[in-house]
Swiss-Prot record:
This is Alpha-S2-casein. It comes from Capra hircus (Goat). The modification Phosphoserine is found at S23, S24, S25, S72, S73, S74, S77, S145, S147, S151, S159. Coiled coil: none annotated. Residues 1-15 form the signal peptide. It is found in: Secreted. PROSITE patterns: CASEIN_ALPHA_BETA. Important role in the capacity of milk to transport calcium phosphate.
Length: 223
């Protein structure tokens, strides 16, 4: 009886030892399997994470690029708008200045015609006539020189003719000459421009006995 109890206890102890050994041998296998699964998951998940990170980075980059392009375009438009406004304002001022200059020069030739339309004495027996021709201040030097030479020649010829004939002036002619002298003295008071004097003096057809004092050509009247 004791022997039977001893064998049962021994069998139970051996069975427990075997179960513990099997459980102990299964535990490393389970641990190894779990570690393998974790490693496999770690090997798979990083790829997914990398793919997610790369795709997210691309999306973020695209979004940043779009935002940067929008900001740059808005800044450029904001910079261009004031420049365009400044250009338009400058153009307006420039156009106003041009219009004022054009209006001034449109009035300027008409202003020059008035002093030139003064009385011109042609002959002592003629009446005072008013010249209404347009004024051209540009006169060539060659024309002036030729006109001076021609006027000197005509004066010399007419003076010689007058002295050869030795004509006597009547009282009416003397009165007319005095009247012309008064007119010339009256117009000497005005400060005429020099170029108007030269042009006006060379365009007059004067006689030696009707020579005014304002003439630039020297003339001595012999009695």
């Amino acid at each position: 009886m004791k022997f039977f109890i001893f064998t049962c206890l021994l069998a139970v102890a051996l069975a427990k030892h075997k179960m513990e050994h099997v459980s102990s041998s299964e535990e490393p296998i389970n641990i190894f399997q779990e570690i393998y699964k974790q490693e496999k998951n770690m090997a798979i998940h990083p790829r997914k994470e990398k793919l997610c990170t790369t795709s997210c980075e691309e999306v973020v980059r695209n979004a940043n690029e779009e935002e940067y392009s929008i900001r740059s375009s808005s800044e450029e438009s904001a910079e261009v708008a004031p420049e365009e406004i400044k250009i338009t304002v400058d153009d307006k001022h420039y156009q106003k200045a041009l219009n004022e200059i054009n209006q001034f020069y449109q009035k300027f030739p008409q202003y020059l015609q008035y002093p030139y339309q003064g009385p011109i004495v042609l002959n002592p027996w003629d009446q005072v006539k008013r010249n209404a021709g347009p004024f051209t201040p540009t006169v060539n030097r060659e024309q002036l020189s030729t006109s001076e030479e021609n006027s000197k020649k005509t004066i010399d010829m007419e003076s010689t003719e007058v002295f050869t004939k030795k004509t006597k002036l009547t009282e009416e002619e003397k009165n007319r000459l005095n009247f012309l002298k008064k007119i010339s003295q009256y117009y000497q008071k005005f400060a005429w421009p020099q170029y108007l004097k030269t042009v006006d003096q060379h365009q007059k057809a004067m006689k030696p006995w009707t020579q005014p004092k304002t003439n630039a050509i020297p003339y001595v009247r012999y009695l």
